[in-house]
Amino acid sequence: MESDKIVDLKDVSIFQKNSLILSKVSIEIQSGEFVYLIGKTGSGKSSLLKTLYAELSVIDGQAIVAGYNLLNIKQKEVPFLRRKIGIVFQDFQLLTDRSVDDNLMFVMKATEWSDKAKMDARLHEVLKMVGLATKGHKMPHQLSGGEQQRICIARSLINNPKLLLADEPTGNLDPETSAGIMMLLLEISKSGSAVMMATHNYNLIKQYPGRILKCSNGKVMEIPADLSGNFTSSFTPGFQTDDIDDETDKGSNEPLPDKAGY
């Protein structure tokens, strides 16, 4: 249904300063879809994420994200768009001098929550969703890497986002912890939020199939599923294993907006 379309890009050009990074980008993402974004470092993955987040301006084509027209969005509207988008980074970006509760409260205050009872209720709700209901009093350094990433996911869920952008969310985690994060992200998509995850980890794509978008040679193409619905390295000439590095790959060096735009 049209109303379920969270991302609708048609013939969009994506620039970094004066350099054309991706041309004629056409993407549709529906509510509840899980979409991988792959491609070599520097291929434009982070530039695409920045465009969806209105960090990079759209100057042509059609670009509707979470109900906002990015072609003519006003600067004062950008914070409201970003409240409908959650972002999860590879390197956590938690406030190290504040407790878990205070990290989440910081986001609530920055996005104009004011009712203390509602804030407390939502804080406990998102912590329970990520399996850390008893960790609110902890400082970030007292948590494992996987727990810190779960807190980042909880932070991204505070405003019930329509779209979750995950930029290498498992890049610093061991395989077992990565699996837990993947299961959580998949549960989020099943609950109705669209999820787009940039990754270099081929093993995750094999284990947790989803749609695949590939950035390559200035274009974004969709890699189709085979008849069984699984993705492999050999079913299509569009998917090459050199597009996916091993788990030690740290992903793109193009940063997304600091502090998730708050």
Q: Could you tell me what each predicted segment is?
A:
Residues 158-162:
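A short, proline-enriched helix->beta-strand linker immediately N-terminal to the Walker B motif
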Residues 139-143, 147:
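Conserved ABC ATPase signature
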Residues 164-167:
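Catalytic Walker B motif of ABC-type/P-loop ATPase nucleotide-binding domains
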